[in-house]
Design a protein with these regions (language model features):
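DPxDG-like acidic metal-binding loop motif
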Residues: 59-90, 95
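Residues at secondary-structure transition points
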Residues: 30-38, 69-73, 77, 94, ...
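N-terminal beta-alpha supersecondary unit
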Residues: 1-66, 141
Length: 233
């Protein structure tokens, strides 16, 4: 079963193809371009260089959030359009699940974080069990100081990953919250990856949906919506 995974939920654009639980190919782009400019050409490229067309794809998977409001909308819209055109089933995957998948071969607590501004992060926590990231804290928006209070009590290794990693690390250092069991994996492990999205979808085939059922997961209002509510009192 070939699944095409798509991520536009943060700065990088990413696509990946798996065949059952095996990686076929993956592609990243981090050039400061908007996802609306990059994601469809990336899909064309990864299909072409593997001798495939959309007719060879059995399912689509997308990271539906949390993350960039605009990016999430673009990814979801692309998947909905392709699903409608080709009548392909879809899977929605939490962006935080996709990030945590990078640490499936480690042992300890995985703390997936994405920048949510104002000393907050989007976060979910995972325990690595038998090579799988088992979610123990569901997706949420949380103050970094409150996140610290949770993870500081953990005795084992703690891996802080995601595009909010630098923000969390800086906050911990400025507030004397660093601990010897906190680890900060490098750039590649901080990425939310289209191939992870595809592989996670394959592991949960019972959760398939049709295109119109795929919805963005925001967790909080956009900045514009927050400002509008303030003006309205």
């Amino acid at each position: 079963m070939k699944i095409l995974g798509i991520d536009t939920s943060a700065k990088t654009s990413s696509v990946g193809i798996c065949d059952d639980d095996k990686t076929v190919d993956e592609l990243f782009l981090d050039k400061g371009l908007t996802h609306s400019e990059t994601i469809l050409p990336m899909i064309d490229e990864i299909l072409t260089r593997n001798g495939l067309t959309l007719d060879d794809i059995d399912a689509l998977a997308v990271n539906n959030g949390p993350g960039s409001f605009t990016g999430i909308r673009i990814g979801v819209a692309v998947v909905k359009g392709l699903a409608f055109e080709k009548n392909i089933p879809c899977y929605e995957v939490s962006t935080l699940d996709s990030i945590a998948y990078n640490c499936k071969d480690k042992s300890g607590l995985v703390v997936a974080v994405m920048d949510a501004r104002r000393n907050q992060v989007y976060n979910a926590n995972y325990q690595i069990i038998d090579g799988k990231a088992e979610k123990i804290k569901n997706d949420r928006s949380i103050l970094i100081k409150d996140l610290y209070l949770e993870i500081s009590e953990y005795d084992g290794d703690v891996f802080v990953i995601g595009d909010g990693q630098d923000k969390v690390k800086e906050f911990f250092e400025e507030n004397n919250m660093t601990q010897d069991n906190f680890y900060y994996p490098d750039y590649y492990d901080n990425l939310q990856k289209g191939i992870n999205t595809a592989l996670i979808a394959y592991s949960s085939l019972k959760n398939k949906k049709c295109g119109e059922e795929i919805l963005p997961l925001y967790l909080k209002l956009s900045q514009a919506e927050q400002e509008l509510r303030k003006k309205r009192g």
